[in-house]
Amino acid sequence: KALKGIIIGIILVFSIGVVVFLGLSVYAYSNLKYYSVYYAQQMPHKEGTEPDLVMLLENMGSIYTPKIEGIRYDDDGGNAIIDTKNNFVLSETMGNFSYHKYHFSVGFDSTFRLHHVSDFTGEQPKREIHEDEIKQEIREVFAPVIDAQPKPRINLQWLFNKKYQDRFN
C-alpha cells in the first residue's frame, strides 16, 4: 500500500511538472512571436540588417496589427503591409522581402539586406538607388505600425537574442 502511494505521488508530481513545462513553453513561444518587433528593436545586430522589419512581416499573424487609416494587412499567402494612400507594399514571401512602389520594386534577403532592384517602366533609373534611403523611406511609411508595437510585461529579450542573434550578425 505504501509503495502504491509513492508511485501515485511520483506520477502526480511528474504529470504536474510536464503540464507546467508545456504551459511555460507555450507562453514563451507566444511571447516571442507577439513581442518580436519590440525584441528585434532592442537586439544588437550587424549594420545593414533590419531585424525589426523582418519580424514585422514574418510574424504578422502573431503581432499587434493596429487599425490605422491607410494601412491594410494581407496575410493571404505571403504576408504584406499595404499603404493604400500611396500604393506602397512591403511584403514577405518564402523568407525574402520586397518593397513595391509605383513601377519600382526592391528585393531584400532574409536579414533585409538589399538583394535586387527592378524598374518595370523599362527606362534607365534617373539616379542611383541607395539602400539606406530606401530603408529610411520604408521606416517612414510603416512607422505607425512599428511604433504601435507593445512592450512585453514579461521580458524574454535574452531568449529572443539567443534564438535570432546568429541570423542578424
Locations of regions flagged by a protein language model:
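N-terminal export/targeting and maturation segments
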Residues: 19-100
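Extracytoplasmic electrostatic interaction patches
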Residues: 69-169
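Hydrophobic membrane-insertion alpha-helices, especially the h-region
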Residues: 5-27
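Polar/charged alpha-helical tracts
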Residues: 4-8, 27-37, 41-42, 54-58, ...
